[in-house]
Amino acid sequence: MIVCPFKDLGRYAPVLPGLEEAVKVAEGLTDLTPRTIPLSDGNRIMIVAGTSRSPVNALSEAHRNYLDLQYIVKGEETVGWAPLDTLEVAEEYNAEKDISMHAGPVEFVRIPAGHCYVVYPEDGHMPGVQLDEPHDFVKLVVKLKV
């Protein structure tokens, strides 16, 4: 897992194919209406608006074919993280949706506006949660093929 200010994300372009294009598109966005923006090579950016939720009874997710880059544009969220091999499978892998769901303890990291995180296939992650009170957020979820 990588956590950093969005402005510093470009340094990871050599090890994240498709990142340079995604950052350029993200930097040019002025309309944050929820939608999906296709990128080259099957990559995409999803603009998501929501309110953080309680982590109680929440499951972590994992992906095999795409990594998640989640950039908090407005508001904040907390993400839970754990090595995938420490979590128990709660819902088997769905190849069509590229997702499996997992149960188990996670560590929490607060992600403020202007920051982002990247999770790889070996990272279980619980996005969009709160540890105190609900927070509204707008974020870009970038899916990059691995």
Set out the residue ranges of the language-model regions.
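Short connector loops at helix/strand junctions that flank enzyme active sites
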Residues: S40-G42, A62-Y66, I72-K74, N94, ...
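Short, conserved beta-strand element in jelly-roll/cupin
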Residues: N65-E77, D85, E92-D98, K143-L144
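A short, N-terminal "cap"/entry segment at the start of jelly-roll beta-barrel domains
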Residues: M1-I47, N57-A62
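Conserved metal-binding segment of the jelly-roll/cupin
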Residues: R110-V129
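Short, surface-exposed secondary-structure edge patches
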Residues: L69, E107-F108
